C-alpha cells in the first residue's frame, strides 16, 4: 500500500457540496459509538454550508448529485464489522479527519479501501469506465456507481477515461486494438 497512490479528487466539503450521502451523513444518531466532538470537524470543513446537506434526519436521494439512492444502510456496515470506534461514521468521517491532518492507526486500511474502490485500479472506477465505454460513451449511465464514487471523492472525467482505455488496451482488457 502506498500513500502516493492516495489522492481523492475532492475535499470533504466538495463532496458534501456536490450532493452526497442523501444529505444525512452525520445526521444518524450513533452517540453510543463515539465521544468525538464533531463541532470541530463541522467548523473546519462545512462552515457556512446549509446543515441540511450533511445533518438531515432522513436519507433523501434528491440530495445526491445523481438523484439516486447509493450505498448500504448504516446497520449493514455495522453488521459487517466495518465500522471502527475512532470513526463510527465510516470512511468519509475518516477522510474528514485525515484531511484535517489527524492521523491514526487505521490510516493504512482506509487508504487501501479507497484505492480498491476509486483508485487507478479500483473496482468501481474500472466498472464505471467499462459501462461508459460499452454504452458508446454515455456519461449519464451508471448513476448509482457514479454517486458511490463521488462519496469516495472521485468524479468520472475524460482524462481518467482516456487513461483507463489505454491501460485496458495494454492489458488486453475489454478494449481490443
Predicted regions span which residues?
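Compositionally biased, intrinsically disordered low-complexity regions enriched for acidic
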Residues: 1-86, 90, 102, 120-144, ...
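Short linear, low-complexity motifs centered on an aromatic residue
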Residues: 98-125
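Short glycine-rich, low-complexity/disordered patches
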Residues: 106-114, 130, 139-143, 164-165
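Charge-patterned, phosphorylation-rich low-complexity C-terminal interaction regions
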Residues: 144-177
Amino acid at each position: 500500500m502506498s500513500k502516493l497512490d492516495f489522492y481523492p479528487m475532492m475535499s470533504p466539503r466538495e463532496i458534501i457540496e456536490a450532493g452526497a450521502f442523501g444529505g444525512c451523513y452525520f445526521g444518524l444518531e450513533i452517540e453510543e459509538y463515539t465521544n468525538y466532538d464533531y463541532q470541530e470537524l463541522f467548523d473546519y470543513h462545512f462552515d457556512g454550508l446549509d446543515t441540511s446537506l450533511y445533518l438531515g434526519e432522513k436519507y433523501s436521494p434528491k440530495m445526491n448529485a445523481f438523484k439516486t439512492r447509493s450505498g448500504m444502510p448504516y446497520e449493514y456496515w455495522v453488521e459487517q464489522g466495518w465500522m471502527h470506534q475512532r470513526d463510527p461514521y465510516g470512511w468519509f468521517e475518516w477522510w474528514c479527519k485525515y484531511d484535517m491532518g489527524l492521523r491514526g492507526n487505521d490510516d493504512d486500511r482506509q487508504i487501501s479501501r479507497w484505492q480498491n474502490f476509486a483508485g487507478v485500479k479500483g473496482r468501481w472506477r474500472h466498472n464505471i469506465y467499462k459501462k461508459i465505454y460499452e454504452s458508446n460513451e454515455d456519461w449519464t449511465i451508471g448513476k448509482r456507481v457514479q454517486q458511490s464514487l463521488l462519496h469516495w471523492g472521485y468524479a468520472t472525467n475524460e482524462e481518467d477515461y482516456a487513461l483507463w482505455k489505454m491501460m485496458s488496451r495494454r492489458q488486453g482488457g475489454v478494449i481490443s486494438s
